[in-house]
């Protein structure tokens, strides 16, 4: 009986120990287009507190918006879209980017910041109690399907169920149920590491995704 409870207790203890090191900060970071982002400190890392919405790389070059599903599915260069190609979704959930935009040498993140690496996501997960528990404190307190109060501490990360855009046909996973977030770390020639959260549990899952899928993006201060 005690052995079965140990992983749960360990996760709870880790969350209690490190929640003190998690805090929203009064400063904001501003991207090239003038969009501002709240920031949150988790351990020694400082993260953006909402999904990226920028439309230009750091050098000023425009990132193309691609609405056409067939074109999206065959892209090998950076692009963004709104979920379901509706700006009102972007106003709430931010933009979806393919990994080619994440990896573009012109820079997707604001100056002095970078798109979170796979290693940084893994550290974040450990700080918040491990994969099975880390999603709960990261999630926003609203907009998730079947949202129920879990009594957990929210830390200002405000992960939203922004959905995703598929690589096979360019169609959308609509908002409300899932958050998919890129890392900047390639896993192989066709895919990169990512993280996912679902409405149905508290996990922050690690996985690989094809590079022309559209996911949300979070940044970490250099």
What name fits each language-model region?
Residues 13-17:
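Hydrophobic core
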Residues 20-21:
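C-terminal motif of bacterial Sec signal peptides marking the signal peptidase cleavage site
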Residues 24-222:
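Conserved positions within compact, well-structured domain cores
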């Amino acid at each position: 009986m005690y052995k079965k409870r140990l992983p749960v207790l360990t996760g709870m203890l880790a969350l209690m120990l490190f929640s003190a090191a998690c805090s929203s900060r009064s400063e904001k970071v501003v991207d090239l287009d003038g969009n501002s982002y709240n920031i949150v400190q988790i351990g020694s890392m400082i993260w953006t507190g909402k999904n990226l919405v920028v439309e230009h790389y750091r050098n000023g070059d425009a990132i193309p918006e691609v609405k056409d599903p067939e074109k999206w599915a065959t892209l090998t260069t950076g692009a963004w879209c709104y979920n379901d190609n509706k700006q009102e979704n972007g106003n709430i959930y931010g933009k979806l980017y393919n990994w080619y935009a994440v990896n573009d040498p012109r820079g997707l993140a604001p100056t002095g910041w970078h798109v979170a690496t796979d290693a940084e996501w893994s550290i974040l997960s450990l700080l918040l109690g491990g994969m099975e528990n880390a999603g709960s404190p990261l999630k926003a307190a609203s907009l998730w399907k079947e949202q129920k109060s879990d009594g957990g501490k929210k830390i200002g990360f405000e992960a939203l169920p922004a959905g995703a855009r598929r690589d096979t046909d360019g169609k959308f996973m609509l908002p409300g149920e899932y958050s998919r977030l890129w890392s900047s770390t390639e896993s192989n020639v066709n895919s990169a590491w990512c993280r996912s959260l679902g409405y149905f549990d508290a996990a922050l899952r690690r996985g690989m995704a094809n590079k022309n899928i559209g996911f949300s993006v979070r940044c970490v201060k250099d």
